């Protein structure tokens, strides 16, 4: 299906579905926006931010007020004047419902169009995706953004205009990806003047522009002054257009009226239903302390009021009260730390969407009076970033599941209860299908067991809240199940933030240190023969051998194909070659290749054996070294120990600098003499097969095995569960060509073929 056909099909499906949702439940936000239309239509501009006939007063920035005035003009033009009556009590009719629902649907069409523009025209979206999967990445981005479950719940049922605002943010992302930084800044400034909650992204923009827009080499002042002036103009134009009419109408008082409505301080630390952030955990800790201390009769504390389910100011019973300024300080400090780390660690390579994710996360997690719907501000840039970097797919899936559970309490009527489950479950499977198309990775990589366990736990709490709580407790403890959902989702979101930070910064100094330390511990256990293994002590024990190898995509070396090729022994008949894709999570560390690949290889081998037990090999051959290693434990040792199968390391090359590291620089001259000796032996004895022991150091852990009449050799070292003599004898029977051991060669060729066909296209592999 072509791009245009996909966009039209998805648009038709989504708009048709949203039309079916017109009769669905609406929240108080429905009356909020109707009243705003009425206020902007019926009152002069100077009274927009003072009109208080209804409790649902205008509290969005002026651009949104102008948008409401535009909707009011359309309503008046088409005869929907009942929408434009200022009333103290809510007004609702079928005509009002139809008009306001369709106003959202038309905004959704704009949003879908912007999703298509960004997904199919952004030059940076698929730069780290293998060439043959790039179109899949673009299609996944479009479908996942256009059908975002949080937007359907919040806009098409609950009722808001988040899709229109998200479209403006995506336009800013698009301009950044195309390096039109002034247009991106202008778009963001427009967005802020529509809804000030998008200040969540502000620090992300600041840090990204400092790194990518401004110049800090050469004559800094001369180079940056015109850039700063241009940026300031781009940012100020929307603000001037937004507030100048109010200054003209009411002077400074007009600005004060806007500020009073936009930044109320009488709403309490958390919303009526706690958003899944740090303050939900803080409230819960305070409640637990109050209950325990009251039970033990230690001190006298006021009963907590934050479990009333009302929007109000409140005090904590035991823990210190938290002021708006205190939360702002936490937001700024946490943002500064993580964004500074992103600049230092990633320098100019970090994508803006990641800056936006971290900036929004800090505001959402520590912000004052955060609404659960604000999770949209995290999921949108996270969706974009996960497409750009497939390493984050599992984090994205977990985030959207947490978002779904946190949004469920918004819809509580019987029909909408089933509807919200259907929407979120459908989106979950859509996400799995399209993300799998981007990487071809197995589902186990996308949905780790720990995530599944947390979803089941949250699911049980949700079922209890919806179907059992009222039946068991009637009208008692109404807030308890909502609090349980808030706490569980807050805990999961905290863990997700930790995982995101680890995935982003963990490949730095700390993760390298940690990876080396754990590798060295494992190697100590390997040298002590702690791991159980089906050892090979005689050639009669060997009936089936297997070679294993990996090949990586050119544009993303973390995406690999693993192939394992099975052969009978000693007659060397091919039995099967099985391959699959994997994502390598850890970075490459010199002399620690096993850290990156060994566990992935061993897990894949065990999964193959589990599915096909008849293919369990007696020996596994790895492309690399075994005991011939600077620490005595190369790749083959790790794979053998982790899989429980005797292993042999077979390397095609013996690079001298690695050899020096392995046996010590003091033996450098001996190595050079030995290499020259081997060349002379092979040159003068072309028809003599056999091997030459690498006996510079004792005990001998490496044999150089000649490949037929070739002057080349392969380098054999024992891995785990087998000795060098037997390893060399087995390998000598596996040479069918003059390149390497046949099972390894077959695995290598197959993995390269699959990379070429499914990742890189027909370009020549390096």
UniProtKB/Swiss-Prot annotation:
Look up and give the membrane topology term.
Multi-pass membrane protein
Q: Does the keyword Transferase apply?
A: yes
Q: In which pathway does it act?
A: Protein modification; protein glycosylation
- Domain of life per record: Eukaryota
What's the protein here called?
A: Dolichyl pyrophosphate Glc1Man9GlcNAc2 alpha-1,3-glucosyltransferase
Matching Gene3D superfamilies:
archaeoglobus fulgidus dsm 4304 superfamily
- Catalysed conversion reaction: an alpha-D-Glc-(1->3)-alpha-D-Man-(1->2)-alpha-D-Man-(1->2)-alpha-D-Man-(1->3)-[alpha-D-Man-(1->2)-alpha-D-Man-(1->3)-[alpha-D-Man-(1->2)-alpha-D-Man-(1->6)]-alpha-D-Man-(1->6)]-beta-D-Man-(1->4)-beta-D-GlcNAc-(1->4)-alpha-D-GlcNAc-diphospho-di-trans,poly-cis-dolichol + a di-trans,poly-cis-dolichyl beta-D-glucosyl phosphate = an alpha-D-Glc-(1->3)-alpha-D-Glc-(1->3)-alpha-D-Man-(1->2)-alpha-D-Man-(1->2)-alpha-D-Man-(1->3)-[alpha-D-Man-(1->2)-alpha-D-Man-(1->3)-[alpha-D-Man-(1->2)-alpha-D-Man-(1->6)]-alpha-D-Man-(1->6)]-beta-D-Man-(1->4)-beta-D-GlcNAc-(1->4)-alpha-D-GlcNAc-diphospho-di-trans,poly-cis-dolichol + a di-trans,poly-cis-dolichyl phosphate + H(+)
| Gene Ontology CC annotations of this record | endoplasmic reticulum membrane
Similarity comment text for this entry: Belongs to the ALG6/ALG8 glucosyltransferase family.
- A molecular function GO annotation: dolichyl pyrophosphate Glc1Man9GlcNAc2 alpha-1,3-glucosyltransferase activity
């Amino acid at each position: 299906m072509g791009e245009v056909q996909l966009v039209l099909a998805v648009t038709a499906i989504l708009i048709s579905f949203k039309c079916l949702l017109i009769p669905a439940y609406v929240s108080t936000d429905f009356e909020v926006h109707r009243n705003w239309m009425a206020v902007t239509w019926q009152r002069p501009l100077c009274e927009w931010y003072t009109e208080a006939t209804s409790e649902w007063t205008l509290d969005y920035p002026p651009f949104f007020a102008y948008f409401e005035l535009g909707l009011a003009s359309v309503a008046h033009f088409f005869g929907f004047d009942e929408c434009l009556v200022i009333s103290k009590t809510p007004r609702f009719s079928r005509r009002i419902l139809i008009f306001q629902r369709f106003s959202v649907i038309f905004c959704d069409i704009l949003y879908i169009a912007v999703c298509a523009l960004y997904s199919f025209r952004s030059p940076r979206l698929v730069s780290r995706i293998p060439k043959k999967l790039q179109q899949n990445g673009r299609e996944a981005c479009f479908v996942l953004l256009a059908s975002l479950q949080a937007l359907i719940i919040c806009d098409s049922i609950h009722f808001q205009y988040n899709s229109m605002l998200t479209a403006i943010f995506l336009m800013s992302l698009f301009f950044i990806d195309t390096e039109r930084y002034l247009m991106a800044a202008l778009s963001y400034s427009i967005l802020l003047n529509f809804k000030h909650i998008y200040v969540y992204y502000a620090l992300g923009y600041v840090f990204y522009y400092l790194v990518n827009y401004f110049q800090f080499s050469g004559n800094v002042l001369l180079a940056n002054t015109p850039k700063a002036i241009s940026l300031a103009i781009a940012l100020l134009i929307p603000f001037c257009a937004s507030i100048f009419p109010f200054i003209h109408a009411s002077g400074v008082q007009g600005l004060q009226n806007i500020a009073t409505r936009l930044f109320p301080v009488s709403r309490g630390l958390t919303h009526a239903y706690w958003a899944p952030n740090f303050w939900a955990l803080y409230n819960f800790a305070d409640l637990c302390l109050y209950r325990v201390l009251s039970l033990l009769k230690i001190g006298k504390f006021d009963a907590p009021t934050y479990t009333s389910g009302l929007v109000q100011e409140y005090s904590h019973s035991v823990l210190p009260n938290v002021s708006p300024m205190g939360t702002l300080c936490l937001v700024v400090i946490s943002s500064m730390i993580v964004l500074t780390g992103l600049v230092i660690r990633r320098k100019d390579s970090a994508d803006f969407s990641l800056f936006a994710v971290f900036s929004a996360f800090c505001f959402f997690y520590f912000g004052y009076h955060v609404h659960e719907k604000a999770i949209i501000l995290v999921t949108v840039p996270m969706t974009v970033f996960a497409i750009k970097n497939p390493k984050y797919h599992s984090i994205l899936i977990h985030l959207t599941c947490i978002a779904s559970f946190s949004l469920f309490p918004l819809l509580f009527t019987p029909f909408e209860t089933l509807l919200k489950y259907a929407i979120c479950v459908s989106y979950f499977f859509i996400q799995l299908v399209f993300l799998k198309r981007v990487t071809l990775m197995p589902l186990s990589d996308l949905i780790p067991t720990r995530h599944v366990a947390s979803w089941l736990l949250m699911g049980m709490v949700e079922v209890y809240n919806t179907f059992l709580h009222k039946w068991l407790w009637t009208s008692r403890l109404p807030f308890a199940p909502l609090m349980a959902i808030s706490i569980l989702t807050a805990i999961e979101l905290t863990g997700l933030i930790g995982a995101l930070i680890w995935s982003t910064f963990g490949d730095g100094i700390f993760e390298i240190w940690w990876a080396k330390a754990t590798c060295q511990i494992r190697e100590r256990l390997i040298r002590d023969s702690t791991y159980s293994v089906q050892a090979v002590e005689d050639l009669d024990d060997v009936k089936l051998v297997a070679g294993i190898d990996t090949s990586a995509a050119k544009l993303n070396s973390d995406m690999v194909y693993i192939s394992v090729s099975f052969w009978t022994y000693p007659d060397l008949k091919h039995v099967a070659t099985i391959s699959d894709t994997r994502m390598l999570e850890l970075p490459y560390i010199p002399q620690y290749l096993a850290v990156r690949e060994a566990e992935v290889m061993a897990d894949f081998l065990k999964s193959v054996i589990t599915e096909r037990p008849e293919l369990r090999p007696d020996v596994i051959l790895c492309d690399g070294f075994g005991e011939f290693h600077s620490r005595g434990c190369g790749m083959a040792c790790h794979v053998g120990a982790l899989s429980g199968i005797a292993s042999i390391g077979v390397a095609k090359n013996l690079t001298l600098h690695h050899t020096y590291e392995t046996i010590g620089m003091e033996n450098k001259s001996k190595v050079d003499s030995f290499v020259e000796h081997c060349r002379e032996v092979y040159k003068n004895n072309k028809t003599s097969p056999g091997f030459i022991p690498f006996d510079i150091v004792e005990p001998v852990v490496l044999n150089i095995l000649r490949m037929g009449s070739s002057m080349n050799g392969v380098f054999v070292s024992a891995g785990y569960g087998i000795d060098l003599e037997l390893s060399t004898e087995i390998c000598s029977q596996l040479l069918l060509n003059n390149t390497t051991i046949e099972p390894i060669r077959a695995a290598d060729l197959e993995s390269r073929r699959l990379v070429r066909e499914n990742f890189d296209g027909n370009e020549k592999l390096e």
